[in-house]
Design a protein with these regions (language model features):
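Phosphate/diphosphate-binding loops
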Residues: 98
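Short secondary-structure transition/capping segments
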Residues: 22-31, 58-64, 87-90, 120-130, ...
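Short, surface-exposed, charge-dense and proline/glycine-enriched linear segments
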Residues: 8-13, 38-44, 68-73, 106-116, ...
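Sequence-level motif detector for i,i+2 pairs with an aromatic at +2
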Residues: 7, 148, 354-356
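Radical SAM enzyme core and accessory elements
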Residues: 158-384
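Conserved SAM/AdoMet-binding glycine-rich loop
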Residues: 1-85
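Generic recognition of stable, solvent-exposed alpha-helical segments in well-folded globular domains
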Residues: 13-14, 18, 22, 56-63, ...
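Flexible glycine/acidic-rich beta-alpha junction loops that bind and position SAM and/or redox cofactors
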Residues: 47-52, 84-91, 103-188
Length: 384
């Protein structure tokens, strides 16, 4: 690290379960963004892992991923492969839940490629593999995974890319985890919504993705109490897989389940979506669901005037008057009654998200009082 030029970054494919203490400590000392780790989990189904001749300690892998996550200086990409032996749709989504709960920066879904001369090509008949005859020789169906389920997983992959891997919906993803019974259901439900509303195969703008997600949530709110689980294990699945995928049972992530947490409201989602929009950039066009800010012009104007006279929260804006600061930063009134300041001169070195400070307005003191300073993406105060 003594030769780090502060610019060059490195990408490593690693087996995180064999990291030792010295290696983990070294990662913790690195400059944010110096390295990026790609960890090929592929599956958490023990029969699948055994059949493809992999040796992986999922408990140690999770511990290593958690440790690196807490450093918040290294992007971690965890990979899953659909179409492996003994993995049907529900088994794959169980693996998806296990890996999602490890909180990767990206959860990359791939599809099995049957390369010439590979072990998988040798097992074509045994696994009843159907795959494309031209590059990339991607799987179309297996003994355990019919073509219709491959198509379903393609839809899930698209939603994961847009709403999770993009990093553009950090606060909203946290709320979605509370709304749905399991992580997989978030993305299967979104994929079904896109398909049912003719939204697939279209190049949507960034703002359109937020509008679509809000309409999806509105519909869920209207139909609450009538929704069915997005993915159910059909009778006979255990016979077809030869396994009930329990690989993650002993090492489930220590988080509250959706059933034990208070369900977010549509108002909560409006706040989270506005947070997600502004934490990335000072947007010029506001979405249709955005709250009216005109009743709070006085509080916003007084905040920036106070910062011009005596900079407290926007110390990097010296030389700019209050009107200029109001254009360079942004103060948004949320539906929960608080204000959130977005400071674009200070950004998280890993995610690129702006510094965010939550305030409440004290009418007696005629000023804003800080509540907390945070990035929901990292879950910690990023100035500390």
């Amino acid at each position: 690290m003594e030769h780090d030029n502060g610019v060059t970054n490195f990408h490593f494919e690693v087996s995180a379960d064999i990291f030792d203490e010295e290696e983990l400590e070294l990662i913790g000392k690195m400059r944010p963004g110096l390295i990026q780790l790609e960890i090929g989990v592929q599956s958490t189904n023990p029969d699948t892992i055994r059949e493809i001749h992999r040796h992986m300690d999922l408990v140690k892998l999770k511990q290593a991923v958690d440790r690196v996550y807490d450093y918040r200086n290294t992007h971690q990409h965890l990979d899953l492969i659909a179409g492996l032996p003994y993995e049907n749709y529900e088994s794959f989504m169980h693996s998806f839940d296990d890996v999602y709960r490890m909180r990767p920066d990206q959860l990359q879904m791939g599809f099995l490629k049957v390369l010439k001369g590979s072990y998988m090509e040798e097992q074509v008949a045994a696994y009843d593999l159907r795959y494309r005859g031209i590059p990339p020789y991607e799987v179309l169906s297996t003994k355990w995974l019919p073509y219709s389920d491959v198509i379903r997983l393609k839809g899930v992959e698209d939603m994961v890319e847009v709403y999770y891997n993009s990093g553009q919906f950090p606060a909203t993803m946290k709320l979605l985890e509370r709304k749905f019974a399991r992580p997989a259901e978030i993305f299967t439900s979104l994929a079904e919504y896109y398909e049912e509303n003719g939204l697939t195969g279209i190049s949507h703008s960034r703002l359109a993705r937020y509008e679509i997600l809000y309409k999806f949530l509105e519909e869920k709110e209207e139909n609450s109490g009538q929704s069915a689980p997005a993915a159910e294990t059909t009778e006979g699945d255990e016979q077809k897989t030869g396994v009930e995928n329990t690989a993650g049972d002993e090492q489930k992530i220590g988080v509250e389940t959706a059933e034990t947490m208070e369900k977010p409201t549509l108002s909560d989602f409006r706040d989270s979506l506005m947070y997600d929009l502004y934490v990335r950039e000072n947007i010029k066009s506001r979405p249709s669901f955005a709250g009216d800010q005109s009743p709070y012009k006085k509080e916003v104007r007084e905040f920036f005037m106070a910062e011009e006279e005596n900079p407290r929260w926007l110390t990097d804006y010296a030389g700019f008057d209050s009107r200029q600061m109001a254009k360079m930063a942004h103060l948004e009134h949320m539906e929960d009654g608080t204000f959130v300041l977005f400071d674009y001169k200070k950004r998280d070195p890993l995610s690129g998200n702006a510094r965010a400070v939550r305030f409440v307005y004290d009418p007696n003191e005629n000023r804003m009082t800080k509540v907390e300073e945070w990035l929901l993406y990292t879950g910690r105060n990023f100035l500390n």
